[in-house]
C-alpha cells in the first residue's frame, strides 16, 4: 500500500490528473475511481474531492488537460501564425508527431479510448469544451 503523503503535497490536482490518465490507459476507464487515484498519489481518499466532485469531473479534467497541453504545444511550434503559409501545415504536422512521441500516454488516452475520442472529436462541442483549440480552427 502507498504511504500517505503529508498535507502539503505540491500540485496535487496535476498529479491526480496524470495518475488518472495512467490508470485509464493501463486498466480502462471502467477501472478508474477517485479512491484508486488517491492511492496512486499516496494521499488520503478524501483529498481528491478538494479538486473533483466525482469520477466524471476528474475524467473531464483529464481530457481538458491533455487538450490544453496539445494545443499549447502546437501553437508554440509555429512562428508564422499565417494559416495561408504552406509551411505552417508542415510545422504543425511535425509538432503533432513530436508531442505524442514525448507524451505517448496522452495519445493512448485520447485515441485508444472510445469515450474520450468521441468527446474530443465532436467539433460542435470544441468551442465550449476546449477553448484552447479555438485558435487552431481559425
Model-derived features: positions:
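Short, structured helix-loop boundary elements
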Residues: 13, 34, 56, 60, ...
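Short hydrophobic clusters on alpha-helical segments that form packing/core surfaces
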Residues: 16-24, 66, 70, 74, ...
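Hydrophobic alpha-helical connector segments
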Residues: 61, 76-106
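N-terminal intrinsically disordered/low-complexity leader segments
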Residues: 1-11, 22, 82
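Amphipathic alpha-helical segments used for helix-helix packing
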Residues: 101-120
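Hydrophobic/aromatic residues within well-ordered alpha-helical segments
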Residues: 55, 62, 66, 70, ...
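Amphipathic alpha-helical packing segments from all-alpha helical-bundle domains
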Residues: 75, 87, 119-138
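Helix-turn-helix
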Residues: 15, 19, 23-57, 61
Amino acid at each position: 500500500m502507498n504511504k500517505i503523503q503529508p498535507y502539503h503535497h505540491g500540485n496535487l490536482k496535476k498529479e491526480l490528473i496524470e495518475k488518472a490518465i495512467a490508470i485509464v490507459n493501463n486498466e480502462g476507464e471502467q477501472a478508474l475511481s477517485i479512491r484508486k487515484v488517491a492511492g496512486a498519489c499516496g494521499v488520503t481518499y478524501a483529498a481528491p474531492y478538494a479538486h473533483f466532485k466525482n469520477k466524471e469531473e476528474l475524467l473531464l479534467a483529464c481530457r481538458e488537460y491533455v487538450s490544453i497541453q496539445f494545443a499549447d504545444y502546437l501553437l508554440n511550434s509555429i512562428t508564422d501564425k499565417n494559416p495561408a503559409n504552406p509551411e505552417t501545415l508542415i510545422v504543425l504536422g511535425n509538432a503533432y508527431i513530436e508531442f505524442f512521441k514525448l507524451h505517448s500516454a496522452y495519445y493512448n488516452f485520447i485515441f485508444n479510448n472510445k469515450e474520450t475520442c468521441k468527446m474530443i472529436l465532436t467539433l460542435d462541442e470544441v468551442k465550449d469544451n476546449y477553448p484552447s483549440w479555438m485558435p487552431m480552427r481559425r
